[in-house]
Amino acid sequence: MELSPELLRKLETLAKIRLSPEEEALLLQDLKRILDFVDALPRVEEGGAEEALGRLREDEPRPSLPQAEALALAPEAEDGFFRVPPVLE
């Protein structure tokens, strides 16, 4: 997939963000590298995947951050929930 500056501007509009020309250039480079990486994935040898999975730690439940502490870290909270800007108009 070819990533053009026009497509990047369309993505900016969809994401409702504004980037400076410098940020656009950097993001365009990063996205091209990511797409090249994803494009290369089908050509990667699959051997050794089982071995890699064995290295993961076990999932163990642990205490999480109390709700009051989590909400205290948020810019805005209301009635025990995070308050965020509307996504849909």
Curated annotation (Swiss-Prot):
EC number from the UniProt entry: 6.3.5.-
Gene3D superfamilies with a match to the protein in the record: 1.10.8.990, Glu-tRNAGln amidotransferase C subunit, N-terminal domain
One Pfam assignment: GatC
Record keywords, A-Z: ATP-binding, Ligase, Nucleotide-binding, Protein biosynthesis
Molecular function (Gene Ontology), one example: asparaginyl-tRNA synthase (glutamine-hydrolyzing) activity
Biological-process GO terms, alphabetical: glutaminyl-tRNAGln biosynthesis via transamidation; regulation of translational fidelity; translation
HAMAP family in UniProt: GatC (MF_00122)
Family of this protein: Belongs to the GatC family.
Job of this protein: Allows the formation of correctly charged Asn-tRNA(Asn) or Gln-tRNA(Gln) through the transamidation of misacylated Asp-tRNA(Asn) or Glu-tRNA(Gln) in organisms which lack either or both of asparaginyl-tRNA or glutaminyl-tRNA synthetases. The reaction takes place in the presence of glutamine and ATP through an activated phospho-Asp-tRNA(Asn) or phospho-Glu-tRNA(Gln).
Record-given protein name: Glutamyl-tRNA(Gln) amidotransferase subunit C
